[in-house]
Amino acid sequence: VRSRRWPVIAMIGLALAIGAGANAVEQNHLASGWHTVARGDEGGDLTVGNLQVHVHGAVASPVLDDDEPVTSPGSFVLVDLSYATTDSWFLPESPVLVDGDGREYTEPSGFGSAGGVWMAGPDIWYRGGLLFEVPTDVVDDLSIEFRPERTQALLPSTVLRVPLTVSLSAEPLVLGYPTVLAEGER
């Protein structure tokens, strides 16, 4: 009877060890996901992954001109930027605004493709605006965070965070579509 227990005990022990090992590997991959944050500044060419970015600035207003005025209980923020890729065409993951407390703000829905991300091409720079809606009290402490294309979502990656200089406007913000830039322009 004893000789039959040892193989069963050994198999249970092996199964527990394999399960614990798999959990440790999975937790390490997930825990290391977006940990590295590269910092950049407005006005310069920056690269993260295969995305090249140039942030020109941002403007905030409580009113958006979307064929008719749209008001916000907070503020609309329009980030002026240009970007391209280093290798191939793709649609970047939507950037987010991050406030001083680490809260993230994504683009609001309902405004069509104006004010949202656009296709990026290899060294083909487009300039446009990305629209966000944030509480008014965080406008002075915002950064924009870019997350490059991830081929392996579980592997560690780098994000680019650029602090924004946001000017305030009483005029409604106007959305437009991105335009292709001449060679060397940003």
Q: What does each model-identified segment do?
A:
Residues 1-78, 82-186:
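Conserved functional micro-motifs across diverse proteins
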